[in-house]
Amino acid sequence: MEFYPVAIEKLIEEFAKLPSIGKKTAQRLALHILNLPNDEVREFATALVKARGTIKYCSTCGNFTDTDPCALCSNPNRDKSTICVVEQPKDIMTMEKVKEFNGLYHVLHGNISPMQGRGPQDIKIRELVARMNEEAKEVILATNPNIEGEATAMYIAKVLKPLDVKVTRIAAGIPVGGDLEYADEVTLSKALEGRKEI
């Protein structure tokens, strides 16, 4: 039996639709919103509606943007010879935090996952191939180091093989500060595979 009015239950239900938000967290968020002053609730709602109405995908790379092309694609200081392929726009934010990559990006908006019913035609691989031109010299595959990410990387490498472009995969391995004792066999294998000369 629920103890909240229908409007609160609906708010909880909507928050629970968000990724990684369970019923308890959704309840806390809903109750927090209800305890905010009206002007803060209006600001929150306005920001949500404005973001949904103005943010779109960059027609070049697929990143979130409010201009087209996005700030990264239109930046003349970016290295146009290197394209880093990621699964989601949030992965670009993660890569940019590292401040080690100065090339362009390509967002697949997913991965190949037969178990989820997603094939190569369901993600932005055709668009990646269309971006291969005289300027593109290297494609870095930075898909997630899981079964779907590996399958996606292997498929893209196969598709790009006939083209005159170098295809590399980011190394996977032991995290900094991690202990070998806790690493699984696949992680250790990838760490050995991706080793560099020092």
Swiss-Prot record:
Keyword Lipid biosynthesis in record: no
Any one GO MF annotation of this record: zinc ion binding
Keywords in alphabetical order: DNA damage, DNA recombination, DNA repair, Metal-binding, Zinc, Zinc-finger
GO process annotations (BP): DNA recombination; DNA repair
Residue span, Toprim domain: 81-175
Residues making up the signal peptide according to the UniProt record: none
Segments forming C4-type zinc fingers: 58-73
UniProt cross-references to Gene3D superfamilies, sorted A to Z: 3.30.60.80, 3.40.1360.10, 6.10.250.240, RecR Domain 1
InterPro entries from the UniProt entry: DNA_Rcmb_RecR, Rcmb_RecR, Rcmb_RecR_Znf, TOPRIM_dom, TOPRIM_RecR
Domain of life: Bacteria
SUPFAM superfamilies in the record: Recombination protein RecR (SSF111304)
Pfam families in the cross-refs: RecR_C, RecR_HhH, RecR_ZnF, Toprim_4
NCBIfam families per the UniProt record, alphabetical: recR
UniProt function note: May play a role in DNA repair. It seems to be involved in an RecBC-independent recombinational process of DNA repair. It may act with RecF and RecO.
Family: Belongs to the RecR family.
Protein name: Recombination protein RecR
Gene: recR
